[in-house]
Amino acid sequence: MKKIIVLFLFLGLSLISCDAEFLDPTKPTEGDVFSSRSGLIGAANGLQSKWSIGRQSPVYTIITGSGFTTNELRLLNAGNVDEAELLTGGVSVSSKNAVINNLWSQSLVIYAEAQKVLDNIGVISVPVEKASIFVHASIYKAMATGTLVQFFEKVPLQTTKNAGFSSRADVIAATIATLKSTEIYLGTAN
């Protein structure tokens, strides 16, 4: 009996003592991505993919959210609960509605990633590439904030913990400022 207890005690201790973190050797770190030319170009191109591909993308959620809330779309499959909630509207829309949550979260992810690209634009040394990437990232940043302000009363303009929420007027002004910042690059961007 003692041997069995000692064996289980040893097995229990060995399970909780393991502190190995296995990293994917093929996945670059954030520092690697934003400190190299190819990484920054890849991150900028990834904005388009994040924006447009999949049911969680802002393209899908914008069309679905606005279409069902304004009765421009019709629900053919009542099994799509999130879309059915939007169609019914009012208190039937739960706080766990995937369309609304994806619109919020994915737009903020795109906003944050675009800002990271803009913050590290100095990595690019070729003026045409720099201009193109700056304009590309700025457009996606502006689309993210512009989308959020269409659907929500207040939106955070920082992507930090406990970021404050800004009014629609402030968000629209920031969106316009983002787009105006591209004017100096428009002559050289591809």
List the model feature ranges, each with a label.
Residues 18-67:
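Membrane-proximal, proline-rich intrinsically disordered regions
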Residues 41, 81-152, 162-169, 180-190:
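Conserved, well-structured interaction surfaces
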Residues 27-30, 156-164:
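Short linear capping/connector segments at secondary-structure termini
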